């Protein structure tokens, strides 16, 4: 059944005209269709109509009338019928305002970005649009990260830190007992190392007992302040890796600096205001 088939190929196009930038994605099943000029021309026509209408949603785009007298959604379905491939008009992003830069990654029509700066600077805008493509930020800055994402990341960081502290104590106790901790790091390894003669059953039992008792004891006596401080450090690293302005800028000729500082180095008042990114590939 065509509706059950996977649409992992397609075409993403992006365009900016007079203070309005938009990108659109139409998915299909094979790169043969995705790279066909008729398919790309159809996506371009839908994008042109969306930009001309300054469309504000995917639903609005689907309803736009094209040159054939049909709306965009029907046109995609007709093309699907002609090629025999499932197709979906399923991605639309836009930014309205001045100082917009658009980027089609390597001209391959599979990944596109839009960036808006607070001042006109085409070269800087282009480089930041490339940064967004390469480094896939999840938010503009720390304040833009949804609270539930922050809470979840912090929770994961706390859990990971606790597990590491317990593991550290267990490994130290196993070493102190004169046992090689690498030989007893999992039940599977324990059995295989006994069979190879690298580990005695007695040492294995001792290590299992240490894991149980020292692990439980350490877990019950963790230093909460220390755990929270380490977790906060991890959360800050998450912001640094995932917030556009805090990411290390990838296209600087000189010193390492984050995106916000690089923009200031080009013009002390220059800053990024917004961005959009869409890709066909799973990341």
Regions found by a protein language model. Give the residues of each.
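N-terminal assembly/interaction segments in proteins that build large macromolecular machines
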Residues: 1-283
């Amino acid at each position: 059944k065509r509706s059950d088939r996977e649409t992992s190929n397609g075409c993403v196009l992006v365009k900016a005209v007079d203070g309005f930038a938009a990108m659109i994605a139409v998915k299909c099943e094979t790169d043969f269709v995705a790279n066909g000029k008729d398919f790309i021309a159809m996506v371009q026509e839908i994008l042109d109509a969306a930009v001309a209408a300054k469309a504000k949603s995917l639903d609005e785009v689907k309803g736009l009338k094209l040159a054939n007298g049909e709306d965009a959604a029907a046109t995609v379905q007709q093309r699907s019928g002609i090629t025999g491939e499932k197709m979906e008009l399923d991605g639309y992003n836009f930014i309205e305002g001045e100082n917009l830069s658009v980027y089609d990654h390597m001209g391959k029509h599979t990944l596109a970005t839009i960036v808006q700066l607070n001042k006109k600077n085409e070269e800087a805008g282009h480089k930041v649009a490339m940064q967004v493509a390469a480094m896939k930020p999840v938010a503009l800055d720390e304040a833009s990260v949804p609270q539930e994402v922050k809470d979840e990341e912090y929770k994961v960081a706390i859990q990971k830190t606790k597990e590491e502290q317990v593991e550290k104590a267990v490994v130290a106790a196993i070493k102190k007992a004169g046992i090689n901790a690498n030989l007893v790091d999992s039940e599977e390894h324990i059995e295989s190392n006994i069979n190879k003669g690298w580990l005695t059953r007695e040492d294995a039992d001792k290590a299992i007992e240490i894991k149980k008792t020292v692990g439980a004891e350490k877990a019950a006596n963790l230093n909460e302040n220390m755990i929270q401080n380490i977790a906060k450090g991890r959360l800050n690293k998450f912001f640094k890796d995932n917030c556009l302005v805090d990411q290390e800028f990838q296209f600087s000729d000189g010193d390492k600096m984050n995106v916000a500082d690089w923009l200031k180095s080009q013009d002390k008042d220059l800053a990024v205001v917004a961005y959009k990114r869409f890709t066909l590939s799973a990341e």
